[in-house]
Swiss-Prot record:
Name this protein carries in UniProt: Elongation factor G
Entry keywords, A to Z: Cytoplasm, Elongation factor, GTP-binding, Nucleotide-binding, Protein biosynthesis
Gene behind this protein: fusA
Compartments it resides in: Cytoplasm
Domain tr-type G: 9-295
Organism: Lachnoclostridium phytofermentans (strain ATCC 700394 / DSM 18823 / ISDg) (Clostridium phytofermentans)
GO cellular component terms listed in the entry, alphabetical order: cytoplasm
């Protein structure tokens, strides 16, 4: 069998991320066109984008799911293949920009080595740009910025660069300048080569390289000097030479910029218009020149069976370890598990260990995905992103690895859903079908939850926003042929603890014959509801007071009971449980008895621990003309909002603040009337906070009506 097609050094794993409508998918489509994957340019406006393959994406012109594909690129120099340049493999993931699908961005960034942040040349840093940027910060992902839509009215490259510096707190360094803007945008100036690149034809394939226009020479010199200084500041050898008045060579500068990009000290900024086919090839060159290969990234950390930290190097010679970052139901091949290989190799047909669940899995087939098309592979190597068919137990965030060398890699944390709706099938016969379909959709999407309201028996689905749940209901009908009636969206309240309590819980049924006996003592205490974990269970039982095999049953009982709080039947967040003692019966004890004892312990604790109602707080950003600012701020305050700050942006005011989600229903209509249709807003989930007492009483009394 042939070995690896491309060495690791010539592999790039990149994501495309941005605010909605910044042009991510259009950029991805142009990348596929220029790298020869597509022979025709896909278009989100016409619903023909390769990467937006779901029917819902094509109808709405937005990205919903992150699509993965692979393409190849050889460095271009003066629009000729660079002498001695070798072809590189690029694994590309296009992610959604809509806040409701933030999970897709989170899991993609977890497994990618780098990302291209796309910014609209007019809108600049928008709310979701900030969200995805913070997600990339969390995983310390190297990235570069592409200022897109340089051809549209109001485009301002320099304003966007300033916004990246001020709003994202990053050292954004332009390595290109635009030639013209709006309808006069013709090309870019390369600040390394100090040449002008003009795009002559509609498809951007005929490029003319000329001297920098006279009226831009001073500006180009100024920005080149600033670029050199920024790069030199990240390299001890270069800064020394620079301060002595010696300008480094382009080769030295590019090498230092690559190191600074990989260590997230610098964000190189490029520009273009993906829709008008300008600047995309130069972006691909920059990806090859400045973005990391898997070998440039820090060793991946994990834990062995004893909980000791171990490291895996990105090498084919290491034992196999990979992270499953996405599960998808494919109508043709069944359950697909997307995974990123961090070390070692994997053959189709072999067995692996799911170290997270301690279950053996068989790799039926390995597929290379091209959006929703697939190609069979015999083997995958370190650094690869692929999908496996045949896994039964694996879910998002699980580690799969070599059975002889178990390791558990750091899992992913996902936000809690903020909106609930009640759902029921239109026919009685559809009940089971709907249950199965919802379970499959919940397996795919960790931010989508399904539960049953114990009081009414209704099925409640919860997600990150109205669009998120609308897409779920649409998929029920299209993919699973289940017609459903859906209630009005409700706020997904949660419940929490305020006090520490110590509970002694015994479940005993011993009235002749085989009995039931489970007894546990558990200390419950509140923990941060917005931390990385919303529930933590520890066992400090000693001396076999409770046999080891029954401890997980106590935990399962507590987790089950947490699905329904005592105030309004809402799920409970922010609980730490320490099972420290108990007792058992040689004959009558079993898992079920301890599960019931755990459940009873939690319900008892919930009544005694000062239960409170928690509500989702949204980060809200409103853009309005100056004249309406006072009215809009007053309205936000009347909605229990907290104003964080305001700033000027192109003649408008941006108001930022935090508002409870319950107060934001119908806000778009209010904003329209207060600003005569000239205001715009966006919001995304920030935290869960306690509901004020007077509001809590109102919410709970409305629920019982």
């Amino acid at each position: 069998m042939a070995g690896r097609e491309y060495p690791l050094e010539r592999t790039r794993n990149i994501g495309i991320m941005a605010h909605i409508d910044a042009g991510k998918t259009t950029l991805s489509e142009r990348i596929l066109y220029y790298t020869g994957v597509n022979y025709k340019i896909g278009d989100t406006h016409e619903g023909t984008a390769t990467m937006d393959w779901m029917e819902q994406e094509q109808e709405r012109g937005i990205t919903i799911t992150s699509a993965a594909t692979t393409c190849h690129w050889t460095l271009e120099l003066e629009h000729k293949k660079a002498p001695g340049a070798l072809e590189h493999r690029i694994n590309l993931i296009d992610t959604p920009g809509h806040v409701d699908f933030t999970v897709e961005v989170e899991r993609s960034l977890r497994v990618l080595d780098s990302a291209v942040g796309v910014f609209c040349a007019k809108g600049g840093v928008e709310p979701q740009s900030e969200t995805v940027w913070r997600q990339a910060d969390k995983y310390n992902v190297p990235r570069m910025a592409f200022v897109n839509k340089m051809d549209i009215s109001g485009a301002n490259f320099f304003n966007v660069v300033d916004m990246i510096k001020s709003r994202l707190g990053k050292n954004a360094v332009p390595i290109q300048l635009p030639i013209g803007k709006e309808d006069t945008f013709k090309g870019v100036i390369d600040l390394f080569e100090m040449k002008a690149y003009y795009y002559l034809d509609d498809k951007g394939e005929q490029i003319e390289i000329k001297e920098i226009p006279d009226d831009m020479k001073d500006q180009a010199e100024e920005y080149r000097a600033a670029m050199i200084e920024s790069i030199c500041e990240t390299d001890d050898d270069l800064i020394e030479a620079f301060l002595e008045g010696n300008e480094p060579s382009n080769e030295e500068l590019k090498k230092a910029l690559r190191n600074a990009t990989i260590s997230v000290q610098i964000i190189p900024v490029l520009c273009g218009s993906a829709y008008r086919n300008k600047g995309v090839q130069k972006l691909l060159d920059a990806v090859i020149e400045f973005m990391p290969a898997p070998t440039d990234i820090e060793d991946i950390k994990g834990f062995d069976e004893e909980g000791n930290e171990i490291h895996r190097i990105s090498s084919d010679e290491e034992p196999f370890a990979a992270l499953a970052f996405k599960i998808m139901a494919d109508p043709f091949v069944g359950k697909l598990a997307f995974f990123r290989v961090y070390s070692g190799t994997l053959n189709a047909g072999s067995y692996v260990l799911n170290a997270t669940k301690n279950k053996k899995e068989r790799v039926g087939r390995i597929l290379q995905m091209h959006a929703n098309k697939r190609e069979d592979l015999d083997k995958v190597y370190s650094g690869d992103i692929a999908a496996a068919v045949g896994f039964k137990f694996t879910s998002t965030g699980d580690t799969i690895c070599d059975e002889k060398h178990p390791v558990v890699l750091e899992a992913m944390e996902f936000p809690e859903p903020v909106i609930d709706v009640a759902i029921e099938p239109k026919t009685k016969a559809g009940q089971d079908k709907m249950g199965e379909a919802l379970a499959k959709l919940a397996e795919e999407d960790p931010t989508f939850r399904v539960r049953t309201n114990e009081e009414t028996g209704q099925t409640i689905i919860a997600g990150m926003g109205e669009l998120h749940l609308e897409i779920i209901v649409d998929r029920l009908l299209r993919e699973f042929k289940v017609e459903a009636n859906v209630g009005a969206p409700q706020v997904a309240y949660k419940e929490g603890f305020t006090k520490e309590v110590d509970i002694d819980s015994k479940y005993a049924k011993q009235s002749g014959g085989r009995g039931q006996y489970g007894h546990c003592k558990v200390k419950f205490s509140p923990m941060d509801v917005n931390g990385e974990k919303v529930f933590e269970f520890v066992s400090t039982v000693v001396g076999g007071a409770i046999p080891k095999e029954y401890i997980p049953a106590v935990q399962a009982g507590i987790e089950d009971a947490m699905k329904c709080g005592v105030l309004g039947g809402y799920p409970v967040l922010g609980v730490r449980a320490n099972c420290y003692d108990g007792s058992y019966h040689e004959v009558d004890s079993n898992e079920m008895a301890f599960k019931i004892a755990g459940s009873m312990a939690f319900k008892d604790a919930m009544h005694k621990a000062g239960p409170i109602l928690l509500e989702p707080i949204m980060r809200v950003e409103v853009t309005v003309p100056d004249d309406y600012m006072g009215d809009v701020i007053g309205d936000i305050s009347s909605r229990r909002g907290r104003i964080e700050g305001t700033e000027d942006n192109n003649g408008s005011k941006i108001i930022r603040g935090f508002v409870p989600l319950s107060e934001m229903f119908g806000y778009s209509t209010t904003l329209r009337s207060k600003t005569q249709g000239r205001g715009a807003y966006s919001m995304f989930f920030s935290t869960y906070e306690p509901v004020p007492k007077n509001v809590q009483e109102k919410v709970l009394s409305n629920k019982t009506k």
